[in-house]
Design a protein with these regions (language model features):
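Adenosine-nucleotide cofactor-binding segment
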Residues: 1-37, 91-94
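Glycine-centered, small-residue-biased loops immediately flanking beta-strands
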Residues: 49-50, 74
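Acidic carboxylate diad motif detector
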Residues: 54-55
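Active-site capping/gating segments
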Residues: 81-93
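C-terminal hydrophobic helical "lid"/dimerization subdomain
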Residues: 90-124
Length: 124
């Protein structure tokens, strides 16, 4: 579980993906932003890749162009962890227990949180 690379989408998303993947495209893109970022992500997905839509922080939900999906044999998957808990709380509990077991057994590890200083933005 994890990512090979993390990209700042505000700094040339497509160019960064091309550089990191030797022009192949990303196998998986996790998109909590939607809107223009989703549109650009669709152009960055590798053949048979998956684009995970987990939110629309931009305020504009994702709208998939099916021609991009067909050309690349790619998938767009919508996911929210909250819905799983509401639809099947027992499933969510079982999965949580499995993850905690893996953590206790050392099969997975948690990363140490990294911090950054938050500065209050001056009022206009």
């Amino acid at each position: 579980m994890g990512a090979d690379s993390v990209i700042n989408y505000t700094q040339g998303l497509r160019e960064q993906v091309k550089d990191l993947t030797n022009d192949r495209g990303a196998d998986v893109i996790y998109d909590p932003v939607g809107g223009d970022v989703f549109d650009e992500s669709m152009r960055c997905i590798a053949p048979f890749g998956r684009l995970l839509v987990v939110g629309f922080a931009s305020g504009r939900p994702a709208q998939a162009k099916t021609n991009h999906l067909l050309i690349k044999d790619a998938e767009v998957i919508g996911f929210t962890i909250g819905a799983l808990g509401r639809l099947d709380p027992d499933w969510e509990r079982r999965n949580f227990d499995v993850l905690m077991g893996w953590l206790a057994a050392g099969r997975i590890t948690r990363t140490s949180p990294t911090g950054c200083r938050w500065r209050r933005r001056p009022r206009p």
